[in-house]
Amino acid sequence: MKACSDDFIIAHTPEEAVDRLAALHQEATGALSHALKRYLKERIRPDASEHCLFRYPELRLTYLCQGEVPTTVRAYAKVQVPGTYAITVTQPAAFRKYLLEQLRPLMNDFTLRVEVGRSQQNIPYPYVVEGGDELAGSGVTAAELARVFPSTDLSAATDGTADGLYDWENIDPLPLALFDAARTDFSLKRIQHYTGSDWRHVQPWILLTNYHRYVDQFIRHGLDMLVGDSRFTRMVLPGNVVIERGMAEGEMQAIIENVVWHRYQMPAYHLQANDGHGITLVNIGVGPSNAKNITDHLAVLRPHCWLMIGHCGGLRQSQTIGDYVLAHAYMRRDGILDRVLPPHIPLPALAEVQQALQEAAKLVTGEEGDELKKRLRTGTVLTYDDRNWELRWAQERPLINLSRAVAVDMESGTIAAQGYRLRVPYGTLLCVSDKPLHSEIKLPGAAGAFYERAVTQHLHIGIAALELMRSQLNSLHSRKLRSFDEPPFR
């Protein structure tokens, strides 16, 4: 069989590189989609020359001039050692802004040879099937298609770079980014499955919550933004249902009432702006498994920040239901990431995020100084994987006491650990909904009054914090999240 040509061509500008990536990806997915439809209809197998087209494009950077130092202290777009860096790329047209943000400073500050061509990594056929209707009624099984077309290879979709599993002294080429095309495509499909949204709707500023009532408040906030004078232009609901600025309020309400969000495990809601800096809220439900699951997938979109805003149990006598907890440390008892990020590894508090949350609380509540301190407690959050941890209180008490924890939940430590691990700025602001150690538990009557008083304000603090960070984007991406062996791309 004749070997496939890789056709690598030097790109002289970032725009030229991304344009060629997009052209090669469109050619590859178009050829694969055409061959797949032809096989479903006529049972004609693709020949060897067609198979050569079913490959992801690859971006390569070769750096030979050791010792060049960038003019800024940014946390990304750096090459640390001479050599060739490479990554396969999927959906380059959709990721164009991100790719240019990485390539422009790299090509400006370093002497590089940038090349684009076809990789040796095949595109699995499921990643060109948009809705699944193409396979319905064809009489062809998935097993048969896997024998004819490239199929998903889970050994290729790994987090080896993010988890530092590669020996950088003996790998060639070096990784250019944390996630290659196969890993990215894997997550793009999962985002759609879990959230009920096309991944293209997800915004770079993300709120994660563990209570549906935050969703109700986010939708109300979104409607206010679309009706009033704001930078937001549309809101996308689960099932890719769109509400546009300019619609009548009655029409908006009718659309909302008919959204079938309960079909999706972790429904997502997207408040979008023309500049691409909108806000996404994901109701992740309860538990560290969900928290890890969704952040594994959202990370491939390279968001600017994710914040956990949800409820927690207050552990201190001085706390009152409705108070806030700003996490500055985490004691991880969730167990889910222990193999890749042992619990003794500290998760640094990111100053840019902490300051934004503190300032947002001040702006939204109108309180400051000692008055704000009465409502906003800073301290360690304990994250469990066992909702009934109280039944082991005698065994858990000594460790909780040593940790000086002020709150307990089931998601925050996992989300922060994922942010640290996957290099996404992270933060946590929780609201005390009960005090399990002081006989103040959630009761139906009290819960309604608590939600009415606290949830709206809490959500607005999270949104205000994201807006503050958006205005200071250049300083947000922290060097605290970079390892010694770090790919050039953010």
What are the roles of these predicted feature ranges?
Residues 1-305, 313-490:
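Accessory terminal and edge-of-domain segments that mediate assembly/interaction
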